[in-house]
Design a protein with these regions (language model features):
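Short loop/turn microsegments at loop-to-beta-strand junctions
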Residues: 6-9, 15, 26
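Generic preference for hydrophobic/aromatic residues in regular secondary structure cores
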Residues: 3-5, 11, 66, 76-77
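Glycine-rich loop-to-alpha-helix module at the N-terminal edge of alpha/beta enzyme cores
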Residues: 18-91
Length: 91
């Protein structure tokens, strides 16, 4: 099956058939497909800076870290590359 587009919870294949996306993909895939607010936020950030890795920080990352720390986790936040990194840090 060759998927060609998505909207919300639905996917469409190259033959125009609609599917309910119960897989959700990885990472942010659980947020659905092409939500206008997410598309706008990603576009705005891509127009400023695409990616710098986690050895440096950015202003949006700092805001997110502060929000996470404010709402729990002992006043701390930590960004890493993978679930394995997150588990090791938690241990």
């Amino acid at each position: 099956i060759a998927m060609t587009r998505g909207q919300g919870r639905s996917l469409w294949d190259s033959e125009g058939r609609e599917f309910l996306d119960l897989f959700c993909g990885f990472g942010a895939g659980l947020l659905g497909h092409c939500h206008p607010d997410l598309v706008a936020a990603v576009t705005a950030q891509a127009n400023e800076l695409w990616h710098v890795g986690n050895l440096m920080h950015t202003e949006p990352q700092t805001r997110l870290a502060e929000a996470i720390a404010t709402h729990g986790f002992g006043g701390r936040s930590f960004f890493c590359h993978s679930g394995a990194d997150a588990n090791e840090a938690a241990i």
